[in-house]
A protein has these predicted regions:
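Conserved PLP-enzyme active-site core in the AAT-like
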Residues: 1-133, 137-146, 151-166, 174-185
């Protein structure tokens, strides 16, 4: 808390960043007063986030949650999935990062202009197919027809994310789809 202003970390992708940097989440959030972590992004829990901070902050958050009707009954099954995510899924994030690097390298082999020279640090690969948002949406639609789901970002940018359900075969088929679209027969 600097100058009396508490600092909060939105840790939606904190585990990915920690694995990529070789740090613990504790080290990453050491200079903040509170942090949330998402258990579904990358960690494969069906739902859930965890809020951490000083005891008085957590007590106040619980009160506000109850006032807003956020109390969840019979949450043991969801909590169990969250525990599995925390205990068993963090280590495998490095596999997602490695597949993102492989995807990035394969895309650069097809068209070097598509991706920056630097490898991605985590599991997100950005591909600039054009400078036009309309062209990016066209690529998105054509890739979807080939079974590859991507998101469009800013003008001409596609965003690909690797995760537990993306294996080496999926990376290969994604690269094949991009190659077919880049060089149609």
């Amino acid at each position: 808390c600097r100058h009396g202003v508490p600092v909060h970390t939105d840790g939606a992708r904190l585990f990915n960043a920690a694995v990529a940097l070789g740090l613990s989440c504790r080290e990453m959030a050491a200079h903040t007063d509170s942090v949330t972590v998402c258990l579904s992004k990358g960690l494969s829990a069906p739902v859930g986030s965890v809020l951490m901070g000083p005891a008085d902050f957590i007590a106040r958050a619980r009160t506000i949650r109850r006032m807003l009707g956020g109390t969840l009954r019979q949450a043991g099954v969801i909590a169990a999935a969250g525990l599995v995510a925390l205990e068993h899924m963090v280590e495998r994030l490095a596999d997602d990062h490695a597949r993102a690097c492989r995807l990035h390298q394969g895309l650069r082999a097809i068209d070097p202009a598509w991706c920056a020279a630097e490898l991605p640090q985590t599991n997100i690969v950005q591909v600039r197919v054009d400078t036009s948002a309309a062209e990016a949406r066209l690529w998105q639609a054509r890739l979807a027809q080939a079974g590859v789901l991507v998101r469009t970002g800013s003008a001409g940018l596609l965003r690909l994310v690797t995760h537990r359900h993306i294996d080496d075969a999926a990376v290969d088929s994604t690269l094949q789809a991009f190659a077919r679209l880049q060089h149609p027969t």
